[in-house]
Regions:
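Iron-sulfur cluster-binding electron-transfer modules in prokaryotic oxidoreductases
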Residues: 15, 91-407
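Cysteine-centered iron-sulfur cluster-binding motifs in ferredoxin-type domains/subunits
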Residues: 19-38, 65, 69-89, 338-339
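Non-heme iron-sulfur electron-transfer modules
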Residues: 1-14, 37-70, 88-117, 394-400
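Short His/Asp/Glu-rich catalytic/ion-coordination signatures at enzyme active sites or charged loops
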Residues: 60, 84, 217
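Short, surface-exposed helix-loop/turn micro-motifs enriched in polar/charged residues
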Residues: 43, 47, 83-86, 243, ...
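Generic structural signal for well-ordered, non-membrane alpha-helices
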Residues: 30-33, 53, 137, 253
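N-terminal glycine-rich anion-binding loops that anchor highly charged ligand groups
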Residues: 29-33, 43-48, 200-202
Length: 407
């Protein structure tokens, strides 16, 4: 796809990067077949090809309106289109650039600005998020439905973590929402890894991965959080930590992008590249281990929801399923497993109606095999699916750790 950049855009390094990405697109339309928002809305501009045209028009100096912004905002960034694309278009990078340019040219309505700023001020701050969640649980009957649905109906308390006692050590990003919404997930991870001879090292100075800010178009703030995490992890990396572990695939996908996002930062480019190389999802670590050491036999019938950030962003489709099968669990078939559940970070709050439709479609697919429980690998998906109030939804490592306790 050829573009005629304006003089303003020729002076913009990110616009030049967008132009190079656009050139890979042959506008074949394969991407529309797997785009969740196109399937729901049937509008070309709510599919990847249409959004690519919109970004092209922005780069060429056409009028940028609230409608332009709306169509770009509706994208889930599920990256299903990238899995489908035969030309290897880096759509998510293009979308990030397009959204950033449009954000500078179009002033959002006040309610939108307030919601986005509120999310940015609350979600990445664990103490604030925890306090407001506790208040929300008390006030649940009086809250709007889309907010009420995001509050956990139940949480499993975090079990004690084992001491640091093994030579093999990994760092773990604790996350910002997960410690409140699913407090036992990281503890369960540490307990399973301990049985495999791996200790999880704390890095208390590390915080939010930066995805919340970045995807709400506060991209510089997101990059600042990335730099903070690199600084927090660096001493442990120099001391020999073998990996930076992520138990939430959304965070993992973002940390793996640090190298790309900070490639032009002279102070952080090399460190960011090394951090991205060390970043692994939990399943990447476990699949290489002798799981027989755990001596468990899974006794549950599960449906696994593979998050978009695991299957499309990190290209780990099918890997959790393989681990669960090795451990003896029974897995049901899930129709249309490639489609997004509608969580998409904060999307369920910024676009509640679309998110609810996608959630209900996904729950129907997950429940079609009549599982005892649904498991997933990302806190956003877990919370969003659980908000339907149907089959119980947990992180898959908690079910593994639960089976471990029975032995």
């Amino acid at each position: 796809m050829q573009t005629q950049l304006t003089e303003e855009m020729r002076q913009n390094a990110r616009a030049l990067e967008a132009d190079s990405i656009l050139r890979a697109c042959v506008h074949c339309g394969f991407c529309t077949a797997t785009c969740p928002t196109y399937q729901l809305l049937g509008d070309e501009l709510d599919g990847p090809r249409g959004r690519i045209y919109l970004i092209k028009q922005v780069l060429e100096g056409n009028d940028v309106t609230l409608k332009t912004q709306e169509h770009l905002d509706r994208c889930l960034t599920c990256r299903n289109c990238e899995t489908t694309c035969p030309s290897g278009v880096r759509y998510h990078n293009l979308l990030d650039i397009g959204r950033d340019i449009v954000e500078q040219k179009v002033k959002r309505p006040l309610p939108e600005r307030m919601l986005r700023e509120g999310l940015r001020q609350v979600v990445p701050r664990p103490a604030v998020f925890r306090a407001l969640t506790q208040v929300g649980l008390v006030l649940r009957p009086f809250l709007p439905e889309q907010v009420r649905a995001k509050l956990p109906a139940e949480t499993v308390k975090a079990k004690p973590r084992p001491p640091l006692r093994h030579k093999r050590r990994v760092l773990m990003l604790e996350g910002c929402a997960q410690p409140t919404l699913s407090p036992n997930t990281n503890a369960a991870t540490a307990r399973v890894l301990d049985r495999l001879g791996i200790s999880v090292m704390p890095a208390n100075e590390a915080g939010c991965c930066g995805a919340v800010d970045y995807h709400l178009n506060a991209q510089e703030k997101g990059l600042a959080r990335a730099r903070n995490n690199i600084d927090a992890w660096w001493p442990a990396i120099e001391a020999g930590a073998e990996a930076i572990l992520q138990t939430a695939s959304g965070c993992g996908a973002f940390v793996k992008e640090y190298g790309q996002m900070l490639k032009n930062d002279a102070l952080y480019a090399d460190k960011a590249r090394q951090v991205s190389e060390l970043a692994v999802d939990l399943v990447e670590l476990l699949r290489e281990e002798l799981l027989e050491k755990l001596a468990i036999r899974g006794d549950k019938k599960l449906a696994f929801h593979c998050p978009c950030t695991l299957q499309h962003a990190q290209k780990l489709n099918g890997e959790v399923e393989k681990v669960l099968l090795r451990l003896g669990f029974t897995l049901t078939d899930v129709p249309d497993s490639h489609l997004c559940c509608g969580s998409a970070g904060t999307y369920a709050l910024t676009h509640p109606d679309l998110a609810r439709q996608l959630r209900d479609n996904k729950m129907n697919a997950l429940e079609s095999g009549k599982p005892e429980m649904i498991v997933t690998a990302n806190i956003g998906c877990q919370t969003h699916l659980a908000s339907a109030g149907r089959t119980s939804v947990r992180h898959w490592i908690e079910i593994v750790e639960q089976a471990l306790e029975k032995e």
